[in-house]
């Protein structure tokens, strides 16, 4: 029986990538800086002390981080009791966004530029907004700028409730984000609007990676908070991903947990399981691992690391999340059988100590555990697509166009 359990720790970078200078991210190090702050006692909100992640250490995260940066994370040394193969990978896609990272992991790097809305104010063209307004029968939009999602609902949420005008905003990523109140605007209305925006962007050749529904609740700016009902309406993959190949060539199953299905536009997904919150995502993953059949990929994205702690520059929260995940990792490891593969990786960085609120261009860990495979140093992988190619070889699928088998 062959099964792959692929877990993406969203934004868990382990040191700036070789091309980080193109993104002004030289020196960024999501994992290393979290470890440093914990060691120095500067990440003690809701937790305390040095970062405690024994299971990640056992899978090789410390050694992988050292190979990526040339030095061990502060307070750690070489770990000799590693049970997994470990290495690190750099991205060849043009962007440092979720879609690019995940597609490249699945064997389809995004080599051309996305459409970005670069103006800090009046970010979306009026001609585009007018098309959306006409088709959606809205009275207008508010926002239309670069913004942090939590900041903009605090600033414009009350006006949105009064006017019923959706809040639209973007970032340095290729995204069109729409924030609306779940009760006063309606969750179904928000999803419908996002589908309309996705249709118009595609029709008029705006190569925007994601339209993101950002629902929130609360009665005033002191109470507004985003809910777990976020949805991503992604552009469809340009080529066949390894998850689609598994379904097409082996009639296999791909179980998508969290926002994975949205990232691939539902393409190459057999079953989509909605799950929110780090603990619940881990529980759902464990549940699906226990019942996974032959030729199955259980594919989980742990979004909280990125959305709750990375973008919000919350070092303590990120550290606490890593410790929570590590506490669930022992059970995950115990469920991996002789012919299974457990793969832990990330899609980009989001250093909570870095300037601004955006992603960081970083190398990502590649940790592969299987009781039936001899542990090995995987080296510096020149593309995330090596993961997709490895999965393709493992399931005896036709070759992917990018990447090399690591095993």
UniProtKB/Swiss-Prot annotation:
Pathway: Carbohydrate degradation; 2-deoxy-D-ribose 1-phosphate degradation; D-glyceraldehyde 3-phosphate and acetaldehyde from 2-deoxy-alpha-D-ribose 1-phosphate: step 1/2. Keywords: Cytoplasm, Isomerase, Manganese, Metal-binding. GO terms for biological process: 2-deoxyribose 1-phosphate catabolic process; 5-phosphoribose 1-diphosphate biosynthetic process; metabolic compound salvage; nucleotide metabolic process. It catalyses: 2-deoxy-alpha-D-ribose 1-phosphate = 2-deoxy-D-ribose 5-phosphate; alpha-D-ribose 1-phosphate = D-ribose 5-phosphate. InterPro entries: Alkaline_phosphatase_core_sf, DeoB, Metalloenzyme, Phosphopentomutase_DeoB_cap_sf. SUPFAM superfamilies: Alkaline phosphatase-like, DeoB insert domain-like. Its main location: cytoplasm. One of its GO terms (molecular function) is manganese ion binding. This is Phosphopentomutase. It comes from Buchnera aphidicola subsp. Acyrthosiphon pisum (strain Tuc7).
């Amino acid at each position: 029986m062959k099964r792959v359990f692929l877990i993406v720790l969203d934004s868990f970078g382990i040191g700036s990538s070789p091309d980080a200078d193109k993104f002004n991210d030289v020196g960024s190090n999501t994992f290393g800086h979290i470890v440093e702050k914990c060691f120095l006692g500067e990440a003690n909100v809701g937790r305390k002390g040095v970062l405690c992640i024994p299971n990640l250490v056992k899978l090789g995260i410390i050694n992988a981080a050292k190979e990526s940066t040339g030095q061990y994370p502060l307070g750690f040394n070489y770990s000799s009791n590693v049970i997994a193969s470990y290495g690190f990978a750099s991205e060849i896609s043009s962007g440092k966004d979720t879609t690019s990272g995940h597609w490249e992991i699945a064997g389809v790097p995004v080599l051309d530029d996305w459409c970005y809305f670069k103006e800090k104010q009046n970010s979306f063209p009026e001609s585009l907004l007018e098309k959306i307004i006409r088709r959606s029968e809205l009275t207008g939009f508010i926002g239309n700028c670069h913004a942090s999602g939590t900041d903009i609902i605090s600033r414009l949420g009350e006006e949105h409730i009064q006017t019923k005008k959706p809040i639209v905003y973007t970032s340095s990523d290729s995204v069109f984000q729409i924030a609306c109140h779940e009760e006063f605007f309606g969750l179904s209305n928000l999803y419908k609007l996002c589908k309309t925006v996705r249709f118009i962007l595609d029709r008029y050749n705006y190569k925007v990676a994601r339209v993101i529904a950002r629902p929130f609740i609360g009665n005033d700016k002191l109470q507004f908070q985003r809910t777990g009902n976020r949805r991503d309406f992604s552009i469809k993959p340009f080529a066949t991903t390894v998850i689609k190949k598994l379904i097409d060539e082996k009639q296999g199953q791909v179980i998508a947990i969290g926002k994975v299905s949205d990232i691939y536009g539902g393409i190459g997904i057999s079953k989509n399981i909605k799950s929110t919150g780090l603990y619940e995502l881990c529980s759902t993953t464990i549940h699906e691992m226990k019942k996974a059949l032959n030729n199955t990929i259980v594919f989980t994205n742990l979004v909280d690391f990125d959305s709750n702690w990375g973008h919000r520059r919350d070092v303590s929260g990120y550290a606490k999340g890593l410790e929570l995940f590590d506490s669930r990792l022992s059970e995950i490891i115990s469920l991996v059988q002789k012919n299974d593969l457990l793969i832990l990786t990330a899609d980009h960085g989001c250093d909570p100590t870095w300037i601004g609120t955006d992603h960081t261009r970083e190398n990502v860990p590649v940790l592969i555990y299987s009781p039936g495979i001899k542990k090995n140093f995987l080296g510096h992988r020149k593309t995330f697509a090596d993961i997709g190619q490895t999965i393709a070889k493992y399931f005896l699928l036709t070759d992917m166009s990018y990447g090399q088998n690591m095993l």
